[in-house]
């Protein structure tokens, strides 16, 4: 983000007092007004059935409940769920919805952490899960074309079978869809070397909110004719168009990879190690970290071997030609040895590599031993600022007297801040909301951002004024207005709607 688009000050007065109050207001308002204002008539349902076929228009309450929630654990009941099978069907649906002013909420797998796919105004959930074809893998040009409902891991395995590689690897890859990945510009551990989703998307087919079908970009590695709508749509959270086809750049599959787990006596040592590695012209595939509190959670919840003296962990993975990997791993171990290393473990087999990664994969389940509920934020700061950010988070934890544990992608400064609460304990939610705002402010003070991967949705929307200036926000809203004049596509996401709108 350019400097001029950042807010110079951090006004707290412009924000709602609490996210739970905000969520409650959402539910009260929509519970009162959806039926009166947005209930779909029998005629509208018949028109939708004519477009999609009766089996692809879900109206029973049981079916609609299945599409009412995402990973935030919030739930809003849509009036109908649509399962289109083609771009043309989606275009007809959007023309109808735009004509009748019916809100439409695009949905992939519903794996998001910010409420981006929640049908907060009832209306239509348009789910692209049936559009799940890998249309082409072009081995000669290193390009693939897919529909939006293709599951990320399935696609990765398909291209790897022919010796190709799609690097973005969000934690949800076993069930998230590529359409959702594009809408949120998903990241993952391998982003430190290869980049995020938008770095691999070179073309899109999209249905606009008014029902037009447009294509952006294409299967070429270069293209500068007109505005770059592909990049605009990538990360737009389903507010500007519905993705119906994706053109993806691929890479040759690396021959091999090698995994290391390094334990440090301080978070500062781990951060210095990250800088030292990159300064020595080594770019690992992954540089994952866990702080001392996270290590303690894993130690208490599992029988995994983690020394008491370890206050930070780096999981480092390198890939490339097999003959160079041992040399590269040994060079990394040599570089970081003076930085407070407690122990270094280098995998020599795939099984040993999996055992090292098991320590990282056990984190989420281990956190539930601390408290049953969590707010999972994903701030990002310059990587040299990671230790300072961790110290600020520790101070925020002490201030509000609630546990906060941190892990994430050290290579790009993306910290997953997990604020652990018990919703049944009076006052815990209010404490968490105060902590969340303080965490966001601390990240911004260090030159960071409130979200590196998860997006804004409704969860972070109240905090937009902390990061985006009013002038920059108005330009963003102008883009939305131009593409969606009636504000029917995923309304209320990124920028909150007022009840009057």
Regions found by a protein language model. Give the residues of each.
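Alpha-helix capping/hinge segments and adjacent helical runs
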Residues: 54, 444-456, 485-489
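C-terminal substrate-recognition/cap domain of FAD-linked oxidoreductases
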Residues: 59-61, 65-67, 251-252, 258-435, ...
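Activity-critical C-terminal alpha-helical subdomain
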Residues: 212, 461-501
